[in-house]
Curated annotation (Swiss-Prot):
Methyltransferase involved in ribosomal biogenesis. Specifically catalyzes the N1-methylation of the pseudouridine corresponding to position 914 in M.jannaschii 16S rRNA. It catalyses: a pseudouridine in rRNA + S-adenosyl-L-methionine = an N(1)-methylpseudouridine in rRNA + S-adenosyl-L-homocysteine + H(+). Its EC number is 2.1.1.-. It comes from Pyrobaculum neutrophilum (strain DSM 2338 / JCM 9278 / NBRC 100436 / V24Sta) (Thermoproteus neutrophilus). PANTHER family: NEP1/MRA1, RIBOSOMAL RNA SMALL SUBUNIT METHYLTRANSFERASE NEP1. It comes from the Archaea. This is Ribosomal RNA small subunit methyltransferase Nep1. GO terms for biological process: rRNA base methylation. The record marks 59, 100, 103, 107 as: Interaction with substrate rRNA. Belongs to the class IV-like SAM-binding methyltransferase superfamily. RNA methyltransferase NEP1 family.
Amino acid sequence: MILVLAESAIELVPREIWSHPAVASDARRRGKRPGEILLDRARHHPAMAGLEDGARRGRPDIVHQVLLVFQYSLLNRRGLGRVYIHTRGDYIIQVKPQTRIPKNYNNFVSLMEQLYALGRAPPHGDSLMELHRGSLAGLLEQLGGRWVVLHERGARRRFAELGAALLNSVVVVGGFPHGDFSNRWVLEKAEAVYSVGDEPLDAAQAVCRAVAAAEASAGLI
C-alpha cells in the first residue's frame, strides 16, 4: 500500500504574515526567523484571519498524526507500505520506511522545519526524509498513474474486500482539516473511491482503518 496524503495543511509561515505579532513573537521565542517556522493554527490563529483559504491551512498536526499511524504500523515494518506527503504549496515529502517519526509534536515540528530548510533530514548521512518541489499530478503519475481515494462519499466495502483492494494500491487521503480536494480530478479520475466510516473521519482515523484492513489482507493480523 502506497499512501499519498494530499493537499496537506503543512507549510512555512507565508511572507504576508511574517510581521504579525503572533508570528513574530513565536519566531523570536524559538530563535528563528518568521519564514523558518511552520504555520500552526494553534499558535498563529490571530495572524491567519486574512489568509487565502485560511480554514484549510496551518495544521501540521494532521501530518504528524498520520505519519505516527503509518510509520509504526506492521504494514510498514514488514515492508508492505510507503508514504508520500503532498503539501498545499506543491512540495512532495518522501518518507523512507525505516524513518522513526518523533512522537513528541514539538520535536516533529523541529524535524519538519529542518526538512524545509535543507531539503532532507537528517542533515548528514543517509537521508530518511526528502523534500522537493512537485505537483500531486506528477507524483501520482510517477507512482503509476492509478489510484484509489478514501472519501466520505465513497462506496462502502466489507473489511476483507476493502483490505484486498487497498493492499496493492496507491491510496489518496486528504491531509486538510475542512472541505474537499481542490483538485477535483483526484476523485474524478480515481479507479475507485471508498468510504471507511458512516460519517466523516479525521485523516488519521481513516488511515488507521485503511492500514488495519490492508494488514488483515496481508495476514498480519
